[in-house]
């Protein structure tokens, strides 16, 4: 059975790999010259299942108003006049209740924990190397109020059986010695000892090499133009003016997925959440982080690779704008100087931005659609790296009609209600503008 995977980020590549392991004949198509050249290229590098939480949370609407007035805010909104932007924000606000937060977080943690297990298994079987560390993630709280507010997350961790530690200032210095000199500015921390780190772009490149050995074909530099469909089936995908056909189709185009789906009558509430990162060469290993630090105040992660520090985070709701905002760089540099002033050389840092495909409830869209041969693997937001292996393996099981190892409840697009409006038979408009 032939499967055509659209998109070669970490999600598309993981989908292709796990499909090939199940015996499918897989082709991956992407406009870029190699895998992981867009959102997967320079993300924060953390694999943190226990910290899998939706942005839509109780209290966020009031916090958002405050953040809009701050210079170093973790969230910024640039109104584009796009109706989809307004609809997405309205849906997000509706998910900012305690009950919705609990449901959404459980779904995210369920998939993230499974994905971490899949990654562990993959690493044990293949020895795949991507500058990985398994030294945990430490969430830093600068105020007592932040520490107290972590109680709701801890309750979900306990319910899900995720190990954790609450740390005082001395405990922070024990697990992250380079923070000993600044521990007095912190109120405490929440540490998840089983979390991991690694270079997502390097991992995706190595996984693609392994997929090639399983027979996967990667076709780069090709423009995915439109889908042809009739009734409840996809007839093919127009790629560079040629109709490519398969038995099954997987859409893993990240933030661009809705553009492809909308003409089919499928309304996928995925919107780009722009993030930024700095990659800083380490100058003093003893003064650099040992694993991943999450700064709760600024929603920024600081992650240790072999000889580099990756600093990533923030969220701009600004459409498909990929310009580099110097104020965001200023914020990232400020946080590094605050916590690790002697760890790396900021003058040699590279600055990057990417569009994370976010859903309003935080949970990705993984599974079947109203079209019998079209499947989605998109909408992972800031957790594409954390959820990649689990999402790819889950999707492969669903396509193979095997019982997945975890419950797929609440993960496919049907959770948003009516999954397809009446669409005119034919094809979509180009997805990549």
Curated annotation (Swiss-Prot):
This is D-amino acid dehydrogenase. HAMAP family: DadA. One of its GO terms (molecular function) is D-amino-acid dehydrogenase activity. Its cofactor is FAD. Pfam families: DAO. SUPFAM superfamilies: FAD-linked reductases, C-terminal domain, FAD/NAD(P)-binding domain. GO terms for biological process: D-alanine catabolic process. Disulfide bonds: none annotated. It catalyses: a D-alpha-amino acid + A + H2O = a 2-oxocarboxylate + AH2 + NH4(+). The keyword Oxidoreductase applies. GO terms for cellular component: cytoplasm; plasma membrane. Pathway: Amino-acid degradation; D-alanine degradation; NH(3) and pyruvate from D-alanine: step 1/1.
